[in-house]
Amino acid sequence: MFAYAFTFLVALAVTFVLTPVVKNFAIRIGAVDKPDARKVHHGLIPRLGGLAIYAGFMVSVIATIGFTYEMVGIMVGATFLIAVGIADDVYSLPPKVKLLGQIIAAAIPVVIFNINIEWIDVPRLGIIYLPEIISLPLTIFWIIGFVNTVNLIDGLDGLAAGIATIASIAIALLAFQMGQWVAAAAMVAMTGAGLAFLQYNFNPAKIFMGDTGSMFLGYIISAVSVMGSMKTVATAVLIVPLLALTVPITDTLLAIVRRKSSGVPIFSPDKNHLPHRLLAKGLNQKQVVLVMYALTAFFSCTALIVIHLSLWIGIAIVAIALVLFVLWARKLGVMQEIVPSPYQMEQKKKKDSD
């Protein structure tokens, strides 16, 4: 336990000390966040806070885990993604360029270091081994999916950092139960870095993590879970991060359905996501974020419980929880374009001018 405590404290201390340094650096180079159609803050706030999270995580991992083959692959890929994030936070990269960077970052541990979903344990069917033609693209898609899921929820002070930290705790607990020291320590390091950053990022935020941080958080969570799936029951290791991030994943899927049905481009930002609908109901930022934390903690605990239950009982519990969550989200209006997106307003302007 001392090793885990040391891992946590190193990440916590390094991130806490470096965040103000990164904040001043971001201001000096003009890397500041401006309000847009998805965000609710006012004024310019420095970003690049993800650099401090990255530094805290890396120093902690190197000091405690060392350079294991799998972690080197993840760290190299994460470093490349950090470079992409910095470029995006400073210069606002085109979406296609950013996606290409994400694909390359995901491919580094998967293709070069052979960290991929090689097999899954399916109840009644047993272990199913996946050929490379399926395993490689599936793992890359898995990592990119998590990267963008965390990136998309980074719209309120402390939201992405808190949700990712809770998910990291859940994965750390699972890895600890399964005797996976490296995966558990990596997630403990992420927990320490996330908690330290929240001291500056919780409402009212003094600094944002930017794409540098949100993409990094999603990357580490997904890549470490894949690393864990190579050494134990793959199904359990992959289910926990999926359920832990149920809230942002479901919110993203509902947003895609909403935009498709309204004829709005999928990547067009708006204020119809779950956090925005909660704000519209009269909750303040802190209250909304705490509600999202509570939901994430609930689904994380559910994940840690159902993996120990029989198949059909586990499926029933998860299905009921998901249905209730989706019905609640629909009632709040996340399936409707209640607040017109910039795309819709632009289309209306064109129509009125014709």
Residue ranges and their predicted role:
Residues M1-F25, I29-G30, F57-A83, A160-D354:
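Alpha-helical transmembrane segments
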Residues A26, G30-A31, D89-Y91, I120-L130, ...:
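Membrane interface segments of multi-pass transport proteins and intramembrane proteases
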Residues K34-P46, K206:
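Juxtamembrane helix-capping/reentrant segments at transmembrane boundaries
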Residues V59-Y69, A87-L93, V111-L125:
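Transmembrane alpha-helix boundary signature
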Residues T79-V84, G101-F113, L138-N148, A164-A170, ...:
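Membrane-embedded alpha-helical core segments of multi-pass
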Residues Y129-T139, A184:
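Membrane-interfacial loop-to-helix junctions in multi-pass transporters
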